[in-house]
Amino acid sequence: MKQYHDLIKTVLEHGVKKEDRTGTGTISMFGYQMRYNLQEGFPLLTTKKLHTRSIFHELLWFLKGETNIKYLHDNKVTIWDEWADENGNLGPVYGKQWRSWETADGRTIDQITNVVEQIKKNPNSRRMLVVAFNPGDVDKMALPPCHAFFQFYVANGKLSCQLYQRSADIFLGVPFNIASYALLTHMIAQVCDLEVGDFVHTLGDAHLYLNHLEQANLQLTREFRPLPQLKLNPAKKDLFDFTYEDIEIIGYDPHPAIKAEVAV
């Protein structure tokens, strides 16, 4: 995907060296935006193989409202292991905020259900947002949300999504985030009887870790291949009824995976 390669090139050329929380060090820039037309194919990187099982199960786990890694482990997904405590708990991370945000007066808000209902009943609304970054809960989270909030937009029968990501690990995290939110947009579009439009990805601190530079430069040498297609089970009309078996990627022919260490 040219948009993603352009991001890597821009940060390598114009980024600044910065220290970071993990002690690894980064090349970073502030403020960057990419746009993917979801009609043109599913935005899954072809210049390195991505582990789609992890991407899809993580999204389903968020949608379940869960914050313990048991579901992930049951499905052979280990991407959250470094942050979980000895009981597998992560604190009030994405699933909690998406499905049961706690208000000051003791109520809980199911943001995902609310936004789907808004899309169906009031598609011209400018309030179709879901927020994961809850300042009142940040100190209780194993890792505060990197993908902080997202907004939907309906025009000409198409559903678009824009994500604001406060912290963007370009080599390891961003490819997962692109695919995850593209999948979510497809799923919500289906249950709302809409086509898909664009996925707009807005990054705050966009960074390449210093121990990912060799891998990023290797990836830039690889030729793009055609994007795959996403096929969802058309019988599913409720967002929370989707399972892993309802998601199929067709025609994914990527270059080999490129290993890199995650910064914790």
From Swiss-Prot:
One of its GO terms (cellular component) is cytosol. InterPro entries: Thymidate_synth/dCMP_Mease, Thymidate_synth/dCMP_Mease_dom, Thymidate_synth/dCMP_Mease_sf, Thymidylate_synthase, Thymidylate_synthase_AS. It comes from the Bacteria. Gene3D superfamilies: Thymidylate synthase/dCMP hydroxymethylase domain. It catalyses: dUMP + (6R)-5,10-methylene-5,6,7,8-tetrahydrofolate = 7,8-dihydrofolate + dTMP. Keywords: Cytoplasm, Methyltransferase, Nucleotide biosynthesis, Transferase. Pfam families: Thymidylat_synt. One of its GO terms (biological process) is methylation. Homodimer. Belongs to the thymidylate synthase family. Bacterial-type ThyA subfamily. This is Thymidylate synthase. It comes from Bdellovibrio bacteriovorus (strain ATCC 15356 / DSM 50701 / NCIMB 9529 / HD100). The lineage of its organism: Bacteria, Pseudomonadati, Bdellovibrionota, Bdellovibrionia, Bdellovibrionales.
